[in-house]
């Protein structure tokens, strides 16, 4: 492939990576990962509410990795509330999983920025055939994509398996018990998914630029070595 086309492809991949890094930085600080509705089970059972009457006992919340806000309703009007995970909810949430989500998000940002620099270096510089070259680009794209995947899996497990929304809604609520009715992932979560997809796409762009996948290259080299051994 002509060098000019390689420059264009690597520049595109670099721009995609930079956009991903900015997106993840923004997503990390916004309370737009999950939007949930919660039912005040205690109040609904007391008055035997059903149908449209349940709307009086339905609250909602949205939150991210550090803070969030919502409204509790238990038949006596809306009660707005705000919360932060650190230090307010440390005793209520699975801390190890939550910290790992933040940690892998930070690693994803760093690796994506490094990947951006590597793509631009390959576009305009004279890269070595080791980590600065295609091998490094493949490696960074794979690790970054894996980090993005881990962030989504860990956060989804925290929300669905450990019932994060219920724990937040019931935090310091001694009288009423809240039950999650619905949850949906919002903007910030899908930014991580988009970033995961972009790293997969960048791997295809590297291949499109004319560089073999690492495992394909090693397989060809192994075949050559076997042929050389047979000759002797």
UniProtKB/Swiss-Prot annotation:
GO CC field: basal part of cell; lamellipodium; microtubule cytoskeleton; microvillus; plasma membrane; stereocilium; trans-Golgi network transport vesicle
Keywords associated with the record: Cell membrane, Deafness, Disease variant, Glycoprotein, Hearing, Membrane, Retinitis pigmentosa, Sensory transduction, Transmembrane, Transmembrane helix, Usher syndrome, Vision
Entry annotated with the keyword Metal-binding: no
Annotated GO biological process: actin filament organization; auditory receptor cell stereocilium organization; cell motility; equilibrioception; photoreceptor cell maintenance; positive regulation of lamellipodium assembly; sensory perception of light stimulus; sensory perception of sound
Chain segments annotated as transmembrane: 8-28, 101-121, 135-155, 186-206
Topological relation to the membrane, as annotated: Multi-pass membrane protein
Tissue distribution of the protein: Widely expressed. Found in the retina.
Main location: membrane
Glycosites: 48
Superkingdom: Eukaryota
Subcellular locations according to the entry: Cell membrane
Entry's disease: Usher syndrome 3A: USH is a genetically heterogeneous condition characterized by the association of retinitis pigmentosa with sensorineural deafness. Age at onset and differences in auditory and vestibular function distinguish Usher syndrome type 1 (USH1), Usher syndrome type 2 (USH2) and Usher syndrome type 3 (USH3). USH3 is characterized by postlingual, progressive hearing loss, variable vestibular dysfunction, and onset of retinitis pigmentosa symptoms, including nyctalopia, constriction of the visual fields, and loss of central visual acuity, usually by the second decade of life.
Family of the protein in this entry: Belongs to the clarin family.
PANTHER family: CLARIN, CLARIN-1
Protein name in the entry: Clarin-1
Biological source species: Homo sapiens (Human)
Name of the gene this protein is made from: CLRN1
């Amino acid at each position: 492939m002509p060098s000019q086309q390689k420059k264009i492809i690597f520049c595109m991949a670099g721009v995609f990576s930079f956009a991903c890094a900015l997106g993840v930085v923004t997503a990390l600080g916004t309370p737009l990962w999950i939007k949930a509705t919660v039912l005040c089970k205690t109040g609904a059972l007391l008055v035997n509410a059903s149908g449209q009457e349940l709307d009086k006992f339905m609250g909602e919340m949205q939150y991210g990795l550090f803070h969030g806000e919502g409204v509790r309703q238990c038949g006596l009007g809306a009660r707005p509330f705000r919360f932060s995970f650190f230090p307010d909810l440390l005793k209520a949430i699975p801390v190890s999983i939550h910290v790992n989500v933040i940690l892998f998000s930070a690693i994803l940002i760093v690796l994506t920025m490094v990947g951006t620099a590597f793509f631009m270096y390959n576009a305009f510089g004279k890269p070595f055939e080791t980590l600065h070259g295609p091998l490094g680009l493949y490696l960074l794209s794979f690790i970054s994509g894996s980090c993005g995947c881990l962030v989504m899996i860990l956060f989804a497990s925290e929300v669905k398996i450990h019932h994060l929304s219920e724990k937040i809604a019931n935090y310091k609520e001694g009288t009423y018990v809240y039950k999650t009715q619905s949850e949906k992932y919002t903007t910030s979560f899908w930014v991580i998914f988009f970033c995961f997809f972009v790293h997969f796409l960048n791997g295809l762009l590297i291949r499109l630029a004319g560089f073999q996948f690492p495992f394909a290259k090693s397989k060809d080299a192994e075949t050559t070595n076997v042929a050389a051994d047979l000759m002797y």
